[in-house]
């Protein structure tokens, strides 16, 4: 499952970046990207798929019996889940899939003292994710350790 997930990730990542970078995406750049991700384990590939909103990688993993309830480390070294990663990076397509398919619930945490997806979105100033998560579920704002006055949700 790892090699298949890596191949799908690289294919989709290449297409996404080609559209963003247009002519800057060369064979040399693709070779560097493949090198970068070649040593990744499955949890790293899934984390990157969530970060880059590459839903087909997540879907493929799930349909093959994979379990997304893995713990990964974010950029600060804190333990988070795939929903946190997606939320912190405005990967709304992945967030919607994970919530609509009841893979995660909106206030799920890795541990009692860890962050929810909304915490991660707000911490990273990921406004699309923040708005989406606030609209998706009724969340008790009083339980959050954030300054609500900083949010400008329409």
From Swiss-Prot:
Disulfide bonds: none
Domain of life of the source: Bacteria
Keyword Repeat annotated: yes
Keywords attached to this entry: ANK repeat, Repeat
ANK repeats: 78-108, 113-142
Keyword Repeat carried by entry: yes
Pfam families from the UniProt entry: Ank_2
SUPFAM superfamilies: Ankyrin repeat (SSF48403)
PROSITE patterns: ANK_REP_REGION
Protein name per Swiss-Prot or TrEMBL: Putative ankyrin repeat protein RBE_1220
Organism: Rickettsia bellii (strain RML369-C)
């Amino acid at each position: 499952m790892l090699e298949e997930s890596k191949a799908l990730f690289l294919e989709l990542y290449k297409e996404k970046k080609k559209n963003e970078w247009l002519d800057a995406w060369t064979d040399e750049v693709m070779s560097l990207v493949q090198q970068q991700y070649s040593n990744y384990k499955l949890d790293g590939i899934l984390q990157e798929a969530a970060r880059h909103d590459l839903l087909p990688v997540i879907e493929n993993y799930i349909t093959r019996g994979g379990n997304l309830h893995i713990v990964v480390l974010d950029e600060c070294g804190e333990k988070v889940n795939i929903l946190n990663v997606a939320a912190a990076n405005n990967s709304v397509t992945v967030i919607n899939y994970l919530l609509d398919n009841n893979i995660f619930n909106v206030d799920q945490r890795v541990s009692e003292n860890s962050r929810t997806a909304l915490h991660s979105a707000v911490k990273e100033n990921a406004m699309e994710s923040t708005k989406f998560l606030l609209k998706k579920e009724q969340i008790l704002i009083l339980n959050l350790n954030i300054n609500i006055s900083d949010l400008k949700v329409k």
